[in-house]
């Protein structure tokens, strides 16, 4: 299997992703001639980056889908030994300014989630990074019900942003998706709008999928595979 080459079709991408299943991160790193970090404290994005590299993703840090020519976003999911997600899933940054006129249909959240290639990764802390296994890939698009849940949450959360009610946003808002600060530290500051329409400085906010939502995606895939 040729790694690090951009796939030309959805079928080719899925075949390559499924070929990775069963390898450890250490084995994949060896094939790509790269070093596995001793821990992920300073390399939090390493797992996602090595999977992107192996599959030939080209977006990098650009705000587009990882396989824009195929309309597919790549997401790794760290899972425990029971196959359950260990953390929420980052979707994209929230537009804190210049957000007038954005609808669900034109939102970056819908763009990112319309077609997703999920790659489960074993991530129990007791297991060394190099020994963690890559799981079977899942190519997913939201069902009608899932999209309605996402849309409802997006519209509710965006209302807080547009009305300048950032101080009222907390992790409890949203059924399947939440808004949380995105930044390595308190020095990560961006522009936003307050309730009076004035520009202020605040922490960047990002949309995240809640763990039960991604757990359901994994569970549905397993049931269909049986």
From Swiss-Prot:
One of its GO terms (molecular function) is DNA binding. SUPFAM superfamilies: Restriction endonuclease-like. Keywords: Cytoplasm, DNA damage, DNA repair, Endonuclease, Hydrolase, Nuclease. The keyword Acetylation does not apply. One of its GO terms (biological process) is DNA modification. InterPro entries: DNA_mismatch_repair_MutH, DNA_rep_MutH/RE_typeII_Sau3AI, DNA_rep_MutH/T2_RE_sf, Restrct_endonuc-II-like. It is found in: Cytoplasm. One of its GO terms (cellular component) is cytoplasm. Sequence-specific endonuclease that cleaves unmethylated GATC sequences. It is involved in DNA mismatch repair. Belongs to the MutH family. This is DNA mismatch repair protein MutH. It comes from Haemophilus ducreyi (strain 35000HP / ATCC 700724). The lineage of its organism: Bacteria, Pseudomonadati, Pseudomonadota, Gammaproteobacteria, Pasteurellales.
């Amino acid at each position: 299997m040729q790694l690090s080459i951009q796939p030309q079709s959805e079928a080719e991408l899925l075949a390559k992703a499924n070929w990775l299943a069963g390898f450890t991160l250490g084995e994949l790193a060896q094939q790509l001639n790269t070093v596995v970090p001793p821990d992920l404290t300073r390399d939090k994005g390493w797992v996602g980056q090595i999977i992107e590299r192996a599959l030939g993703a080209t977006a990098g840090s650009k705000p587009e889908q990882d396989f824009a020519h195929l309309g597919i976003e790549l997401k790794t999911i760290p899972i425990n030994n029971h196959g359950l997600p260990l953390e929420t899933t980052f979707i994209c940054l929230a537009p804190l300014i210049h957000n007038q006129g954005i609808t669900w249909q034109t939102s970056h959240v819908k763009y990112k989630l319309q077609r997703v290639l999920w790659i489960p990764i074993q991530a129990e802390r007791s297991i060394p990074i190099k020994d963690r296994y890559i799981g079977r890939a899942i190519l997913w698009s939201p069902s009608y019900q899932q999209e309605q849940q996402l849309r409802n949450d997006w519209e509710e959360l965006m209302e807080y942003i547009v009305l300048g009610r950032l101080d009222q946003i907390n992790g409890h808002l949203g059924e399947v998706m939440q808004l949380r600060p995105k930044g390595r530290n308190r020095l990560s500051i961006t522009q936003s709008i307050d309730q009076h329409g004035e520009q202020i400085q605040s922490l960047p906010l990002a949309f995240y999928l809640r763990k039960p939502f991604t757990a359901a995606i994994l569970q549905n895939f397993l049931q269909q595979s049986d």
